[in-house]
């Protein structure tokens, strides 16, 4: 009988040791959060980059969709009266989002993707940021563009939302799948 009790006690002790919290501050496999990859893509280019990032990081992919989709006429940057031109000329413009708020609570790292419009993030990105509690999150911008860089857009996001943890952004124009995967995996580790 004593052997049975001793054996049960030893098994219980091993179970407790296996379940005990790691006191070295390391994350256990079950507690790591997956990144959230959110993106706005009017033409599909940024969506392709976002899918690659989500695949590379094992992240959750979600679209930032405006309530009213952009038409080709809306995106005509040569027309000062086009919807995109009017929005970008108005720093207070906040296009409404389609659907409800996203659950960002379970994610520590959030990749935020967008096309560069007028050297900035489209105003729908401001709507997303202002509609979600992103404090304490690591925000990693990525973008696509026909000719502009990402630096000014990140500078403007940092200026508009200084309380948030914005990392340096990455322009993914023409980047290979392997290059995007390598960058995304490193950025998700931050």
Regions found by a protein language model. Name each.
Residues 1-8:
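Bacterial N-terminal signal peptides that target proteins for export
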Residues 11-12:
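Repetitive helical segments and hydrophobic/amphipathic motifs
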Residues 15-18:
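C-terminal motif of bacterial Sec signal peptides marking the signal peptidase cleavage site
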Residues 20-108, 112, 119-121, 126, ...:
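N-terminal beta1-alpha1-beta2 submodule of the flavodoxin-like/Rossmannoid cofactor-binding fold
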Residues 57, 132, 161-164:
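A structural signal for short coil/turn segments at secondary-structure junctions
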Residues 114-115, 144:
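Conserved strand-to-loop "acid loop" that flanks and positions the catalytic carboxylate
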Residues 140-176:
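Short, glycine-/small-residue-rich phosphate/pyrophosphate-handling segment
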